[in-house]
Amino acid sequence: MNTHRYLPMTEEDKKEMLATIGVDSIEALFADIPESTRFKSQLAIEAALKEPELIAHFQKLADENQSIKTYTSFLGAGVYEHYIPSIVDHVISRSEFYTAYTPYQPEISQGELQAIFEFQTMICELTGMDIANSSMYDGPTALAEAAMLSCGHTKKKTILVSKAVHPEARAVLKTNAYGQRLNVIEIDANANVTDIESLKAAYNDEVACVIVQHPNFYGSLEPLAEIEEIVHQGKAQFVVSSNPLALGVLKPPGDFGADIVVGDAQPFGIPVQFGGPHCGYFATTKKLMRKIPGRLVGQTVDEEGRRGFVLTLQAREQHIRREKATSNICSNQALNALAASVAMTALGKQGVKEMAKQNVQKSAYLKKQLSLAGIDVVGDGPTFNEFVINCGQPVKDVNRQLLEKGMIGGFDLGSVEPERNGQMLVCVTELRTKEELDLFANEMGALV
């Protein structure tokens, strides 16, 4: 007799289910699918492997990957290799936490709710905002949600977004806006920052929000004070997308009058991995508190006066208001938010500041070394941990040669902006050593 590790349902189960919905066969269930589009052949699946054989097979496939564990990486562009305290994996792997699901029953979820509350608190401290949610799927979806909130709040349909915002974030924004029949206008960038004159020309009373990234896609710092002055001429919302690590050394967007601050918490405790998952954050003002998307954890007291934590302001959410909900996020990135919380806690306020400072200092050092090697550094404004260089040839060719030297080169800007062909976005984090930076500069000098 054959043994089966997993039987989803028996033939009797299938008959009972079909009878319940009033059809007599699987074919009848899928009758609305045209015959011409149905797959009727046998799937070309190989014979089953024994578990040791299966492990060996996937290990062989995994060994074909080129990893940052064996290569020195200078690639960022939205996903960053940072130090992760060893305690992070220990805490998030505990059975009490090992889920991304929403803790609907606060009386049995105090530990998880407190951890989420601490995440919200730390995000507020970094951004200078009044309130933050429990997490979003990633930075781009958080940015899109900020735009949707702004349009709903102002009753306007025009969104101005800087071209210095990450192109993938802009793509997610456009996808969301299309379904809502909203108008997205992109503002030109000049010298790697938002062009102020272009913003002034595009701004009018029909604008719901202005979105910038700080530090932006090119690593440059935006003139937030100038931009805020333009945005708040009318009733538009000022939305800033920020790398939270950069806020360890930068003045928080809240101090510049931002109405909404979003971003990705990946730099804290979340490793570089293909396809994610990440952890978006969303912070705003008390004025917009009841319109914020996602779960909110609040602190309260029980009937005996003891401190406790609950999901609060749930009237915004789909399990309460259904189609009238202002938030349609269900299970979120709670596990990754916990990883970010543990990382920030382990580093401490001074540790976060020191980590951010090292990013600034090491990227500045590499900029100088590349210039000495004859490489053209594009733009002379302040940057965080990324900057643009001219390679004078296809970046993919340079990166191919760098890979042979054991290095992963920077992002090919020409792949998303044809007018930037030959330009590379270089990333330097605290993990890069002086020897690695010197070697990269020397190799680039020889290649370019």
From Swiss-Prot:
SUPFAM superfamilies: PLP-dependent transferases. CDD domains: GDC-P (cd00613). This is Probable glycine dehydrogenase (decarboxylating) subunit 1. The gene is gcvPA. The glycine cleavage system catalyzes the degradation of glycine. The P protein binds the alpha-amino group of glycine through its pyridoxal phosphate cofactor; CO(2) is released and the remaining methylamine moiety is then transferred to the lipoamide cofactor of the H protein. It holds the Pfam family GDC-P. The keyword Phosphoprotein does not apply. Signal peptide: none annotated. Coiled coil: none annotated. GO terms for biological process: glycine decarboxylation via glycine cleavage system; nucleoside metabolic process. The keyword Oxidoreductase applies.
